[in-house]
Amino acid sequence: MDKQVLLKQELIEDEIQIVTRMKRKVLVKVHLMATVLAVLVISTFFITSLVAELGGDPFFIRSVKRRILYFIPLLVFVMPALAITGNKLARNSTSPQVLKKQRRMKWVGINGLMLVMLAVFLYYRSHYHDIDLVFLLAQLAELVLGFINLLLMVLNARSGLQLSGRLKS
């Protein structure tokens, strides 16, 4: 009877390990998809804003600002998914690389909040006021913060690939 109990306990422990590995695989996939989607959306915002400003066409600038405003809700779902899966994958890790990723993500979050406010302001300013010096200064701030966020996210993606062994240090 003791053998049967031990055997059942071993089977249960094996099943728990399998489920844990499966959960981790799902977390990794969701984290990867959220990373790719976030980088694509943010880089699209950055590039279209830059092209619109360099072109100087007020109609195109307004169009870009409207579309950015429409797509911000996508980031409202993607960025928390990225943070939650990243934190679950990191668990209580003390790895310097994981700690760097977590520090970078805090800055991405802070910059992201400022970028959302700037996007709303730039939409409002481009549609209900002239595209003037105030607009251009806010646009410059948005481009700088957007570039910083892209850089931080690319550095985090590289660190993630190194941690997974898919990229050599």
Regions found by a protein language model. Give the residues of each.
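Short, Lys/Arg-rich, polar N-terminal cytosolic tail immediately upstream
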Residues: 11-25
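Polytopic transmembrane helical bundles with strong interfacial aromatic enrichment
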Residues: 22-169
